[in-house]
Amino acid sequence: IVASKRYGDYVKEIAESMGCFEEISFVDNDREGAIGKLEEVDTFYPEYRYAIAACDDGEERLKWNKRLEMIYNIPVLFHKDSTISPSAEIQLGCIVEPRAVIGCGSTICQATVVGANSVVEPYCLVGDGCTLKSGTIVKSTSALNIGTETEQGTVLFTPLDKQ
């Protein structure tokens, strides 16, 4: 987990809930117990094959994931208590928090965070690097621009045909 600051602990718990990672470590300049600094991130391959940025800022998260994907596999992390439709597309570097719901036919683009208890209704397009904070509702057939950030409990309806 790279460049995580406070959000990293939450992301670690999400990754642990998936039960598929043997070891989860941090690379960060400000985290006690990190395995290394940000400038050393390239040196941990092949011991670590997966890496994901967990920055609070969507643009920074996207930038880090683009850099990481040159060396590492970038996972999608989704909490075991989230619900993702089989027809939804979740792209690399996304983080789906507990009890989030992603509806059929929706696309969640790269490095987007879907917050706890958020709902992305069917047939939505959520752009790269978005941050949907807890309780956000994205109404059916909406399209969100790259880098959209919501506040808790926001309800959005931005029809695809108006984008």
Describe the residue ranges of each PLM region.
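Terminal amphipathic alpha-helical/low-complexity segments used for targeting or macromolecular assembly
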Residues: 1-80
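Structural signal for interior beta-strand "rungs" in well-ordered beta-sheet cores
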Residues: 77-163
